[in-house]
Amino acid sequence: MTAITGVILAGGQSRRMGGEDKGLLQLHGQPLYQHVLQRLHPQVDQLLISANRNLSQYQLSGVEVISDSLPDFPGPLAGMLSALQAMKTEWAAFCACDTPFIPRDYVVRLCQQKGNAHAVWVRSVQRDHPALALLHRDLAGPLEDYLLRGERRLLHFLLQEGGHAVMFPDDESAFSNINTPEELTSLGAR
């Protein structure tokens, strides 16, 4: 199998969390991004964290931290673009920092089902999860053009580039992301 960079997307503004940096919120005594890191690290060859604030706290993990090359937090696509431009491998597996329960075979399953596509993402029983995606570095140019046109719709971009979903009929909670303080409290009680 080809080398893959795992990328934790932690660069958002977290408006529904009152502006707190979601990746640094605590779940079971450790930051959310650390839960993702522990699940993603064994599945990839290299790691990056895409963050736009609290960089020194993310750097404590020992993982290379990159920031968006485009200003003003233009969404997860900006973090994906920065990672595609910075990575040294052909492929990147992306995870949002607030998805602490991704499957331990997430990357291999995406790789097995990608075929000739340059983009694949998770589809659970309930919905698509386009921020949980495997992208080829050749998408950096088209993605930059897309963002410079003012576009921000992640799933639209992936479809436009010929990508397809990969079905993950796992427990839906494997793809739960944490958007509110109430959701974090609920997960902490498990």
PLM feature segments, named:
Residues 1-151, 156-175, 182:
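Nucleotide and nucleotide-moiety/phosphate-recognizing core
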